[in-house]
Amino acid sequence: MGKPRGRKLEKKIKDQEFHPEQDSEKISENYNYDGHPESDTSNPQMFFGVLDRDELEYFKQTEATLSLDTFETEEEKAQFVTNVIQEAEGKELKLVTSQICSKLMERLILNCNDIQLKKLFQAFNGNFYNISCHKYASHVVETLLVRSASLVEKELITPHFDNMDASVDGSDVFAPMESLFLFMLNEIKPHLKSMINHQYASHVLRLIILILSSKTLPSTTQNNSIVRSKKSKIARKMIDLKDNEDFNKVYQTPESFKSELKMMLNDLYSDLTGHAKPKAEINPTVITKFREFCVDKVASPVIQLIIQVEGIFDRDRSFWRLAFNTNDEKDAKEQSFMEYLLSDPVGSHFLENVISFAKTKYVERLYRVYIKDQIVRLAKRDTTGAFVIQSLLKNMKDKEVKEILDALLPDLSILLNSNMDFGTTIINACIKQNNYKRDEVIGQLMKKYYPDGSSEKNILESCLLLASSTLGNTKDDWPTAEERRRSIFLEELIDFDDKFLEVAIESMLNLPEERLLQMCYHGVFSHVVEHVLQVQRVDIIKRKLLLNILIKDIVKLACNAYGSHIVDKLWDFTAKLTLYKERIAAALVENSEMVKNSVYGRQVWKNWQLEKYIRKRWEWKKIIKESDLETFPNMRVLQPNMQERAAIKRKNDDKAFDSMKKSRK
């Protein structure tokens, strides 16, 4: 058969390439995966009316009052919350869709009691999907769901609540929180597919999956929260809207939640695939559309979470099979999809995460078929493929990890130019593999940061980039995130091998004294100085040289937020150097007024036990000896027992008698 060429070959290659739709949300909302239009049932109703001027002003004032939180007692605050909830009755939907009043609703949910929580939950019945799609109301739903999960666990552990059967006035009877939650799930089930890539509802869906699968419910303000968007986390910090103790926890859930999760994901799979059964032949169009979800910036985190939890009840990993093949053969369309994942920021983040919790045999297949032959090339893609390679180093078996290390080590010094995290990952992989090629790793790192041929080598300059940093600035610039990353990396190098500790100290001693002292006052670089003060790893000569510099500014260091930690560390660092310890103590006592007037200085004064230095010097010296012996146990000189003493005395007496006889002769 002749070799294919020309336009037919070009068309075939083009058909096999993966090109995600730019407007995938629009397409997925209007069409099923089999290409047929779907009924328009997922368009949310998000207008529920507006508050009148007086109501709006009242709720604004109550939001400000709760925000200030100046209540004298908890009872007073609880009564205030009760009054506001009563005033808000019947207006809940108007409140949650208002920018200002939605914050009030979140504060009410965070501060209400269990009965009030159920009442608020019931107020949204029939509209959970609608408000989940709203910019402001979706945040209220997330807060409500977290508190509801806490109450579900509470009722599960303590099944009977005499005071939970009715409301305070006896007008309402509430079902268990579990039933209310399941009722809410039935309401949103028909809309699951449209929620996957909805800008706001996707966050609610992820939280629901986390609750049903008993995973950690994330904080809404932490930077690494997996539910809230970056803008939302920043906004909550700015308006001082804090989580309560129900967040950032794992909750025990009833068996019905696991069953509901299974049913929900099965329904979603059926909806996505045109009612195909698991492991059945899937339409290629369905697979392409699902892969578009995998690289969609909104839908991708939802798909990642689904792939993570499906293993709880589905051994066949149906959703994984929608994204990837499971046979050992290379597939042209899958290869195009993998190349897109490895070169796209969203796609690489998706692949990086699913590698960490997918079945090992599935990850090994992807590595063997598509990644193994291009490890170095992918590692040089700083914002995409590099993160996938790092994830493989953390999660693959020993054999594959060693293969990756063998491929990367010759180019490590080049990779570190643009991706310092690679150094950390390789160090950790080396340690995990019983110090595999440790000497080569050290050699490559030294070549990068402390080259032998350089006359001006200084690991502080090469690793921390001191010359272009905020060190010594008089503008009160905050340390940058890049400086923080570099400092942490240098500390990891110091922990990895004594060579890096030695060159770090050597580099500090080669700096101008003023420059080294500036590091001690820096919010980030001070941690590096503190980290080298490891008494058992630094020889006594280097310790003395460092102490000679630090003692010159010891009083100011003790009164500084960052320098005080260094002074505290000097207590141990001066072990077996009592003279230096006494010089530091004398300098601090001589400037006692300045030290005691500083909150940091007072802590140093306490840690150095300077009151005993002044009043009971002998006891202070005794503490020094005990501390030195604890740091260097081999210093202890064992006292001879009684028999040994007698033997020594007899030996000495015999020597004295022999010498006396000789003198007489």
From Swiss-Prot:
Residues 1-42 are annotated as: Disordered. One of its GO terms (cellular component) is small-subunit processome. The keyword rRNA processing applies. Keywords: Nucleus, Repeat, Ribosome biogenesis, rRNA processing. The keyword Membrane does not apply. Transmembrane segments: none annotated. Residues 12-28 have a biased composition (Basic and acidic residues). SMART domains: Pumilio (SM00025). Disulfide bonds: none annotated. Pumilio repeats lie at residues 87-122, 123-158, 187-228, 285-321, 333-368, 370-406, 510-547, 548-586. Residues 1-11 have a biased composition (Basic residues). It comes from the Eukaryota. It is found in: Nucleus, Nucleolus. GO terms for molecular function: mRNA binding. Signal peptide: none annotated. InterPro entries: ARM-like (IPR011989), ARM-type_fold (IPR016024), NOP9 (IPR040000), PUM-HD (IPR033133), Pumilio_RNA-bd_rpt (IPR001313). PANTHER family: NUCLEOLAR PROTEIN 9. Belongs to the NOP9 family. RNA-binding nucleolar protein required for pre-rRNA processing. Involved in production of 18S rRNA and assembly of small ribosomal subunit. This is Nucleolar protein 9. The lineage of its organism: Eukaryota, Fungi, Dikarya, Ascomycota, Saccharomycotina.
